[in-house]
Every structure is written in C-alpha cells, then in structure tokens.
C-alpha cells in the first residue's frame, strides 16, 4: 500500500505543479498584453511664447495647436524607457500680440515619445518636428520677417496626466523657431519660448 500511496502522491504533486505553472504563465502573458496604449489621439493645445536669443524686437505670441497623434511603436520593458512613440501632425494658428507682424498660420509634423511607468498617472514626454506656414510679413520694416512664407521648428517637453481611459491633461514647455532659411537678406529669424497646456482625447 505504501508504494501505491507514494505513487498517487507523486502524480498529484505533478498535476498541481503543472496547473500552477500554467496559471503563472497566463498571468505573465496577461501582464505583457496589458500595456497597449491607444492608437489615435486628438489634442487641443495652447501656449504663450516670448521672443528670446536676440530677437529683432520684443515679441509675445499666442500659440494654438490642433494635433492628431498616431501610435507607431510600443517599447515593452520594465526599465525607464517603457513607453511608446507617436507620429503627429499639427495645424497652427498664432496671433502675434506684441511684435511687428500680426499673425502666423502653418503646420508642423514630427514625433513624440511618451515615458509610461506602471501604475502611474503621470507620463513625461518630449517631441519635435518641422513645418511651414505664412506670416503677414513687413519686409520694409527693420527687424521684420523678410517674406510671408516661413519654415518652423517646434520642440516640447512636459508631463501628461491621465484623467481616465479617454482623457489626458498636458502641461509643458515649448520652443519655436521661425525662419525663411535665408531666402531673403537679411533673414531675422524668431526664437520663442514659453509654457504650454493642452487636453487630449484618445481612442
């Protein structure tokens, strides 16, 4: 009887170990599948920018961006690089409150990376892109932009706060460069810095 009991015990132990191993494997798979950020986002962002780095005159510009972001890669790791990439395109409308010109309209395309840590509602990010647009230039005024057509460079860094599964709030710092890349002489480019806030809807 003892050999039979020992045999039955070994079989039961083997079955239990297989069952628990299966559960552990399923939990591991589920944990890896859990990080699946939304594929598409729309954001409305605004900022207030100040001229810096030897501006031709004192500039203060309001910035309004309507942005679509598309996820194109997820970094699934336990380290600080855990996160995802996004391609974005922004429509830009900027009233110039203080400066020679009065407005700037354009677009910008680029990339954004979001650092997502487990169990945190705060998501640090940085982004950068290039684009073009039009400004109501006054080339006859010293220090003004030399022509209407102007290139732009944007870079930003900040933090998103996850409100719920669909909505996020963003706060950060923004840099913008406006220039016609030497198509006129002189070419008094603009360098602008300032705070930025926004709201994002994901789906």
Label each PLM-derived region with a short phrase.
Residues 1-35:
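Cleavable N-terminal export/targeting peptides
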Residues 22-39, 72-85, 99, 116-123, ...:
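Short loop/turn motifs that connect adjacent beta-strands in outer-membrane beta-barrel proteins
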Residues 40-50, 87-93, 126-132, 171-175:
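Transmembrane beta-barrel strands of outer-membrane/channel proteins
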Residues 49-53, 75, 92-98, 132-140, ...:
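Sequence/structural signature of outer-membrane beta-barrel proteins
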Residues 64-66, 190-203:
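Outer-membrane beta-barrel "beta-signal"
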Residues 66-68, 107-111, 126, 155-157, ...:
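Membrane-embedded beta-strands of outer-membrane beta-barrel proteins
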Residues 70-72, 113-115, 159-161, 201:
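Residue-level signature of outer-membrane beta-barrel architecture
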């Amino acid at each position: 009887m003892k050999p039979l009991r020992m045999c039955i015990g070994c079989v039961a132990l083997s079955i239990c170990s297989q069952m628990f191993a299966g559960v552990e494997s399923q939990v591991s798979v589920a944990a890896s599948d859990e990080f699946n950020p939304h594929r598409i986002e729309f954001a409305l962002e605004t900022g207030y920018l100040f001229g810096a780095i030897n501006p031709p005159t004192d500039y203060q510009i309001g910035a309004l961006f309507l942005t679509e972001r598309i996820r194109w890669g997820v970094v699934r790791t336990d380290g600080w690089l855990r996160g995802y990439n996004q391609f974005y395109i922004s429509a830009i409308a900027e009233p110039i409150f203080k400066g020679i010109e009065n407005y700037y309209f354009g677009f910008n395309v680029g990339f954004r990376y979001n650092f997502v840590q487990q169990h945190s509602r705060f998501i640090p990010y940085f982004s950068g892109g290039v684009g073009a647009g039009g400004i109501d230039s006054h080339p006859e005024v010293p220090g003004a932009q030399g022509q209407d057509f102007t290139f732009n460079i944007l870079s930003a860094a900040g933090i998103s706060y996850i409100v719920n599964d669909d909505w996020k709030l963003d706060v950060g710092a923004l840099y913008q460069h406006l220039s016609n890349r030497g198509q006129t002489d002189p070419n008094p480019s603009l360098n602008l810095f300032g705070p930025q806030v926004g709201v994002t809807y994901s789906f």
